[in-house]
């Protein structure tokens, strides 16, 4: 418990870690594509982001070493990589930890969406394998609601004093009465029961979106339906014209972020980051139908124009 710090959310915790452990100009590996909110937070501190590609096993450690083996830290989302949905393999987790030990670097583990795993056992956190180099960032924004503004850090014992000092220079800690209320919910089993109810609902929502896109988009969209999380990624095929994703989104009249928004280096086809929490089934089906049809129409028109 002495290594757990309560913060106002993941971005607050990440900012504390940077202020406590790094200096402006220090190099930080960042998944590319990656979570845009964390990208903005890191850039605001003055560190230098080193974009590292992601494949089917997570962040490509060898590519990171080639780009900057002496980086001071790495920011990763190993449980449910944003936005690809990939879960980092155990081999890749070990490789990342080995690099951190050799380089004397820190790993900021954002355990994004780990609570909503739909199949298989829970994944082993990096902090559970190599705790001395890992700062674990967690939040209740997805399990409860974002407006709660409560998250937490699990910090290696040797770093606690530095992170506490950084927090004392900012806002001390979130309101205690909210922490007490949340602690009561946890102790009474309310949150665990809530999670058990919501997992099958979100799994069903994922399947509704994936099935509708498969039906209406055909080969115009390639789907990655992950085994956890609250969004899926639908990408355009290789060779899709530049700007097609924006046109498709506009014609479909949906709100979503594009895959290109999450990229530092623009490479590969664009796509759509599709969240499915908080919507009725008929709304999800309708949005997926419009997106699939718009993708078919725009790409068909582009093909005829060539």
Q: What is the predicted role of each segment?
A:
Residues 78-82, 142, 279:
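Short glycine-rich anion-binding loops that position phosphate/pyrophosphate groups of nucleotides
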Residues 1-103, 115-129, 133-135, 202, ...:
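Conserved core of the PLP fold type I
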Residues 135-215, 222-224:
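PLP-dependent aminotransferase class I/II
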Residues 30, 51, 109, 182, ...:
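Hydrophobic residues in well-ordered beta-strands that form the structural core
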Residues 155, 233-239, 255-296:
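Conserved PLP-binding active-site segment of the aspartate aminotransferase-like
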Residues 200-210, 221-235, 242-248:
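Conserved glycine-rich beta-strand-loop-beta hairpin in the small C-terminal domain of fold type I
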Residues 20-22, 40, 95-96, 107-108, ...:
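A generic "structured core" feature
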């Amino acid at each position: 418990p002495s290594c757990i710090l309560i913060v106002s959310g993941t971005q607050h915790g990440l900012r504390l870690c940077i202020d406590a452990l790094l200096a402006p100009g220090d190099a930080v590996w960042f998944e590319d594509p990656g979570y845009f909110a964390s990208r903005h937070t890191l850039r605001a501190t003055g560190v230098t982001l080193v974009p590292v590609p992601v494949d089917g096993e997570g962040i490509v450690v060898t590519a990171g070493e080639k780009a900057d083996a002496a980086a001071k830290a790495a920011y990763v989302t190993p449980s449910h990589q944003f936005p690809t949905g990939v879960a980092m393999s155990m081999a890749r987790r070990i490789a990342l930890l080995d690099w951190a030990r050799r380089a004397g670097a820190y790993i900021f583990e954002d355990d994004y969406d780990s609570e909503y795993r739909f199949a298989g056992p829970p994944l082993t956190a990096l902090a559970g394998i190599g705790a001395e180099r890992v700062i674990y960032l967690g939040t209740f924004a997805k399990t409860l609601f974002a407006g709660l503004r409560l998250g937490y850090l699990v910090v290696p014992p040797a770093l606690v004093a530095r992170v506490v000092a950084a927090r004392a220079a900012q806002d001390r800690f979130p309101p205690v009465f909210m922490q007490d209320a949340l602690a009561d919910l946890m102790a009474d089993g309310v949150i665990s029961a809530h999670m058990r109810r919501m997992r099958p609902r979100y799994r069903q929502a994922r399947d509704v979106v994936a099935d509708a896109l498969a039906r209406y988009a055909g080969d115009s969209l390639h789907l990655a339906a992950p085994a956890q999380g609250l969004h899926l990624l639908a990408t355009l095929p290789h060779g899709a014209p530049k700007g097609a994703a924006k046109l498709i989104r506009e014609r479909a009249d949906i709100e979503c972020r594009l895959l290109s928004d999450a990229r530092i280096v623009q490479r590969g086809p664009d796509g759509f980051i599709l969240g499915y929490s908080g919507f009725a089934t008929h709304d999800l089906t309708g949005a997926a139908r419009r997106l699939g049809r718009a993708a078919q129409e725009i790409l068909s028109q582009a093909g005829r124009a060539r």
